[in-house]
């Protein structure tokens, strides 16, 4: 009976950690998509000051969340996202709004892709 109790406790702990990680991943991706979409809106207005401030906010948020996101995702995805975030910051400083919007949309797509690939499904589990 002791072994069964221990096994059930370990199973419940594993499930709780998995669900918690999944929820945390969703929040991280949602917050980052929101930040990047704010950059897109500012860049479409071609407002240099607002675009710079939105980029700075997104960069701060990225710095806080990228290490945790790296725990949940493939490292090649993280490398691509890191490159995109650096390019976004540089394009904002250079006031290259068309290319900035393109890179922002690509990063939003990457965050959506991470959400989709990490969503539990029969294909992902088996």
Write out the residue ranges for each language-model feature.
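C-terminal-biased regions
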Residues: 1-41, 52-126
């Amino acid at each position: 009976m002791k072994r069964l109790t221990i096994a059930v406790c370990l199973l419940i702990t594993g499930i709780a950690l998995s669900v918690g990680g999944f929820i945390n991943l969703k929040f991280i991706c949602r917050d980052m998509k929101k930040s990047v979409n704010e950059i897109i809106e500012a860049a479409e207005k071609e407002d240099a000051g607002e675009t710079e401030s939105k980029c700075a906010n997104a960069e701060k948020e990225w710095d806080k969340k990228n290490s945790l996101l790296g725990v949940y995702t493939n490292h090649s995805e993280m490398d691509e996202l890191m490159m995109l975030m650096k390019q976004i910051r540089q394009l904002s400083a250079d006031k290259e709004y068309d290319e900035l919007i393109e890179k922002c949309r690509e990063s939003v797509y990457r965050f959506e892709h991470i959400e989709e690939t990490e969503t539990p499904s029969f294909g992902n589990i088996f």
